[in-house]
Amino acid sequence: MESEKSKFDYYIVTPDSLFERVDGIPMTKEEIRLISLNRLGVRNGGHFLDIGTGTGSVAVDMSRLAGPNGKIIALDRDEKAIKLARINLDRLSPYKNIQLVLADAYAYSPADSFDAIFIGGGTGDLPNLVSKYVPFLKSGARVVINAIQVKTLNDAVESLELNNFRNVSVIEVQISVGMKTGSSYAMIARNPIFVVSGEQP
């Protein structure tokens, strides 16, 4: 029988259907992960931070792309999210290269520097959050922020520009998914997501 970890060998990112879910704990959907991970530039042997890991979906795919010599820190302030992320990482991550941390992102102090940081949720004050982590970014490191609300989008762009990030980019992603209705399919729209990214000098 095919194992859970081998099922995603056919995919660039792990299918949403393979993740355990709990109501109230957010998950970055696979289409958004694909774009976000590309913008992050996750590579073999790199060091990456996932802020607001939720279900752990981004961390799982970071783990695969970073390989056995990579290192991922997945951070969340919600104990239920950390427990759920642990279940998903144990089932789906092919490498033991992820450290789960229960902490508020504004209070957490990393011991190392990062090649890229993903900010996916639980971020009420983006300008201060981005400023806090700038000293922990390597030269040329990337930050990617996912936003649903327009205010969060504006805060994300402002945060990167105030910290002198280069090549600040905004992509709006609108996904519709086909649902069987009788003999045909109806396209059901999901919420639009803004993917904001920038590079450290």
UniProtKB/Swiss-Prot annotation:
The entry's keywords: Cobalamin biosynthesis, Methyltransferase, S-adenosyl-L-methionine, Transferase
Signal peptide bounds: none
Keyword S-adenosyl-L-methionine in annotation: yes
Annotated residues for binding of S-adenosyl-L-methionine: T28, G52, T53, G54, T55, G56, D76, A105
Species per Swiss-Prot/TrEMBL record: Thermoplasma volcanium (strain ATCC 51530 / DSM 4299 / JCM 9571 / NBRC 15438 / GSS1)
Pathway: Cofactor biosynthesis; adenosylcobalamin biosynthesis; cob(II)yrinate a,c-diamide from sirohydrochlorin (anaerobic route): step 8/10
Enzyme Commission no: 2.1.1.196
Protein name: Probable cobalt-precorrin-6B C(15)-methyltransferase (decarboxylating)
Family, as annotated: Belongs to the methyltransferase superfamily. Archaeal-type CbiT family.
UniProt-listed Pfam families: Methyltransf_31 (PF13847)
Entry's Gene Ontology BP terms: anaerobic cobalamin biosynthetic process; methylation
Gene: cbiT
Catalytic activity of the protein: Co-precorrin-6B + S-adenosyl-L-methionine = Co-precorrin-7 + S-adenosyl-L-homocysteine + CO2
GO molecular function, one term: protein methyltransferase activity
Statement: the UniProt record of this protein carries the keyword Transcription regulation: no
